[in-house]
Amino acid sequence: MLLAIKEFFNSLLLKELFKGLALTGRYLFARKITVLFPEEKTPLSPRFRGLHALRRYPNGEERCIACKLCEAVCPALAITIESDQRDDGTRRTTRYDIDLTKCIFCGFCEEACPVDAIVETHILEYHGEKRGDLYFTKDMLLAVGDRFEPEIAANKAADAKYR
């Protein structure tokens, strides 16, 4: 009974309200951690999933062996692959397209690839004025991979112990 009366007076005297206001005041005058995005950039994780790229081997040959695992595992059906068989019996892609308007950047394609041919880079700032500008062909994906290969290799090496 005595405890109930004490709790009634505490609530009547608005003890909880003042506790809440004190907490709000503490954070109101604390240092802000806002980042002004276009001028300042926060560091990205090695596992960040941005724009796709196709990689090549050091001898210049493209890595994709046309196994079509990435196409099969893609939940958004954003990847289209066509392949031909070479004279030596290996398969290579003749068409490798990714529709970025469909892609949900889940990373399943990257995980499914047995030869690390398809990767997602740290490029997050890309745009298109028309819908067709976000439809990446094999040549465009290879160009992205060629341009950012040192960064891609460094991120793969940094993330290797977690795979």
UniProtKB/Swiss-Prot annotation:
Its cofactor is [4Fe-4S] cluster. This is NADH-quinone oxidoreductase subunit I. Its EC number is 7.1.1.-. GO terms for molecular function: 4 iron, 4 sulfur cluster binding; iron ion binding; NADH:ubiquinone reductase (non-electrogenic) activity; quinone binding. Residues 54-84, 94-123 form the 4Fe-4S ferredoxin-type domain. The keyword Methyltransferase does not apply. PROSITE patterns: 4FE4S_FER_1, 4FE4S_FER_2. Gene3D superfamilies: 3.30.70.3270. The keyword Kinase does not apply. Keywords: 4Fe-4S, Cell inner membrane, Cell membrane, Iron, Iron-sulfur, Membrane, Metal-binding, NAD, Quinone, Repeat, Translocase, Ubiquinone. It holds the Pfam family Fer4_7. GO terms for biological process: aerobic respiration. SUPFAM superfamilies: 4Fe-4S ferredoxins. Belongs to the complex I 23 kDa subunit family. NDH-1 shuttles electrons from NADH, via FMN and iron-sulfur (Fe-S) centers, to quinones in the respiratory chain. The immediate electron acceptor for the enzyme in this species is believed to be ubiquinone. Couples the redox reaction to proton translocation (for every two electrons transferred, four hydrogen ions are translocated across the cytoplasmic membrane), and thus conserves the redox energy in a proton gradient. It is a peripheral membrane protein. One of its GO terms (cellular component) is plasma membrane. [4Fe-4S] cluster 1 binds at C64, C67, C70, C113. It is found in: Cell inner membrane. Binds 2 [4Fe-4S] clusters per subunit. It catalyses: a quinone + NADH + 5 H(+)(in) = a quinol + NAD(+) + 4 H(+)(out). It comes from the Bacteria. NDH-1 is composed of 14 different subunits. Subunits NuoA, H, J, K, L, M, N constitute the membrane sector of the complex. The lineage of its organism: Bacteria, Pseudomonadati, Pseudomonadota, Betaproteobacteria, Burkholderiales. [4Fe-4S] cluster 2 binds at C74, C103, C106, C109.
